A protein has these predicted regions:
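Serine-esterase "nucleophile elbow" of acetyl-processing enzymes
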Residues: 10-58, 66-76
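Bacterial N-terminal signal peptides
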Residues: 1-6
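Alpha-helical cap/lid subdomain in secreted, periplasmic
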Residues: 38, 45-48, 64-178
Length: 178
């Protein structure tokens, strides 16, 4: 995905919009320790001329993301990472609403020809198996529908490790971001 963007011989740095919630915004972390600066550093270290735009808003839901997407795309964007839905699940919002909002976000990005990496989320266990069965298929279903790349669980390898999470047990530490 990223390699293909770099191969297009652009004169300017590839601009990736990291569009999400507090996990994207780096909630509770010092400046420079969050996901966006860590991703940009890693990609640059691998030789990619890239700028990662911080489109993270703490507390945001898929509805909030949909409402602010056009504004967030005001600058030139060559690709997008969409990481939304955790707050929908934490609030127990209906999974069908999260699905509809993410579907609309991916549709708008596709209409602009912006390739997407969709970062999946998991529902909290306390919401039960019915909620989980409705929520968790959203990401693979929509990635397939919109021909987006899928990272199945944004917090993979981090969520279950208390040492990689802040005291709230939800947000990664600087080490967890890595």
């Amino acid at each position: 995905w990223f390699i293909a963007l770099g191969a297009s011989a652009q004169a300017e740095a590839v601009r990736i919009l990291a569009f999400g919630d507090s996990l994207t915004a780096g909630y509770g972390l010092a400046q420079g320790e969050g996901f966006v600066p860590a991703l940009e550093r890693e990609l640059r270290a691998r030789g990619h001329d890239v700028t990662v735009i911080d489109g993270g808003v703490s507390g945001d839901t898929t509805a909030g993301g949909l409402a602010r997407l056009d504004w967030s795309l005001g600058e030139r964007v060559d690709a997008a990472i969409v990481e939304l839905g955790a707050n929908d699940a934490l609030r127990g919002l209906p999974p069908e609403e999260a699905r509809a909002n993410l579907d609309a976000i991916l549709e708008k990005l596709a209409d602009r020809g912006i390739p997407v990496l969709l970062a999946g989320m998991r529902s909290p266990p306390n919401l039960g198996p019915e909620y989980r069965a409705a929520f968790e298929p959203i990401y693979p279903d929509l990635a397939e529908k919109h021909d987006a790349l899928l990272y199945p669980f944004f917090l993979d390898g981090v969520a279950a490790d208390a040492s990689l999470n802040q005291p709230d047990g939800i947000h990664p530490t600087a080490e967890g971001v890595q």
